[in-house]
Amino acid sequence: MIKFLVKGQNIETLEHEIIAADQIAFVKIHFVFDNNWKPLHKVVQFTQDEITYNRVLGTENTSCFLPAELTAGTVKMSLFGYDAEATETVRATTVVKTLHIRPSGFEGENNNVPPTPDLYQQLLEKISEKGKDGKSAYEIAV
């Protein structure tokens, strides 16, 4: 398991293992948040070669899978969070944590990787899940 503590604007490693390339929905990253982060809507960002992949955690989730598009090399990971209930804009950010992905031994015919949904798609999915309990969009918003 890979586990990080998000404390203030810093990401500290709690548990780490070697990450190999070519994984799909296999490497799970778990976060422990300090009290300042707990009420925030959280998003993890993974950046490699100037391409950023977002994983929405929301307010309840504390883990996500590493995006399958990441290849061997270095990856910059950071988080941001915002308080949708606040009267003034609140956005928390972290410094970048560098992850290292090693080449795998995978040699397969089908190297197609399903794309990670972009941030907008993930947020729409969260909104549609909220409406399943019979509440209207207005009731969800207030």
Where are the regions a protein language model picked out?
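Collagen/collagen-like triple-helix sequence repeat recognition
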Residues: 102-142
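N-terminal assembly/attachment segments of tailed bacteriophage virion structural proteins
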Residues: 1-108
